[in-house]
């Protein structure tokens, strides 16, 4: 069994996130927890430490990165969060938390997937997994479909190179493609 905690942004509830984790741990002790977060709040070392103090035996924080270039990540996100996200990753690693990276692939980012993979290898060797995610066409992505959508077939060369680069170096890359009925 697994419980996914997402949002919005789950860390916006502050310390109540730890109350929730501890409650799940008490009531469903064998249940894995997956938290999808932008990672920014974990740039606060104290907050990252509080997560570690929950001592949940099967918890993973999944954090999306949109580029290996700060300006590009910030443009896509719409806020200057790159360096705080990176610091959050380092703080979580400092406290030995299991981390997954989510790399959302779209028209504006696919060309740099091999360089992005190299960046991940050199800067985040501690992550448990790297998931290359096909873009979901919801929310702002749906509104900007023409600027963002690219068929996975059209980026398979770059994706293959990125995945093999990470796998050959002992990391755990995954590919997530979404089924569409169209």
What does each model-found stretch correspond to?
Residues 2-4, 13-133:
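Radical SAM/AdoMet-radical enzyme domain recognition
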Residues 174:
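Aromatic-lined carbohydrate-recognition surfaces of secreted/lumenal glycan-active proteins
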Residues 101, 124-129, 139-171:
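C-terminal scaffold of the Radical SAM
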